[in-house]
């Protein structure tokens, strides 16, 4: 048994110790976990995750920039991930997805309540047995019952530093406020809109010469970069969720 990499963090405020260890060699999972349980204090949390490619399902509406970036990186090696399917509530992005020989499924929200539509979406997702669900500009507010089916497994990209500019037309809101930086936040989804544990953030500087459309173009670049960087860390099993925050080791 060989330790390839080991990273640790102590949160002195809460008295919590976090550790991520990469192992290689021949060992019995059950025996290793039993040995850990006997060595660790009562109440400790441990996971043993096998190496290998993770499966994701991507949810979309109409915007293509984040989806297109993930498709390109998955196809050409920028992300070691299997995209099992892309599911949308509109047909808009079907042609883009099918160019990469990935299944696109339409689960329309028309004629359904939020709860009904979320149940249909959840069933479509679960049919692919993904490790994670990625919201690539999926513009529907998820119900608590949907979120509960995928705890700490749903990753969203938000168009600002949270909780600023919640909702529609964020870059027009930013323009009206005369902001000097715009950014994006990738986070896990919880029951509170755009308030889940933050995984990754970034900003770019803008000035008074930027129109709302200029901000939108620049913001889309930040969004897709932040989402792919966050997903890279999640897929590598580097992200620990504790309370409403993350530790990345």
Please report, for each region that a protein language model flagged, where it lies by residue.
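One-carbon transfer enzymes
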Residues: 5-249
